[in-house]
Amino acid sequence: MAKAVTIKVKLVSSADTGFYYVAKKNSRTMTDKMVKKKYDPVARKHVEFREAKIK
């Protein structure tokens, strides 16, 4: 079997609320860490979410 191109990553809120999203990322084209601005329902505003490893 071939190695999977897409991997699942955890996007953790930079507001330190403990909230996170799970996203897919193409490991061949996106070699750097993913950063997205998304809504954090705990903080009730849009904040940056940074990539972390799923344990």
Curated annotation (Swiss-Prot):
UniProt superkingdom: Bacteria
InterPro entries listed in its UniProt record: Ribosomal_bL33 (IPR001705), Ribosomal_bL33_sf (IPR038584), Ribosomal_zn-bd (IPR011332)
Protein known as: Large ribosomal subunit protein bL33
Protein family per UniProt: Belongs to the bacterial ribosomal protein bL33 family.
GO biological process, one term: translation
GO molecular function: structural constituent of ribosome
GO cellular component: cytosolic large ribosomal subunit
Keywords: Ribonucleoprotein, Ribosomal protein
Database matches in Gene3D superfamilies: Ribosomal protein L33
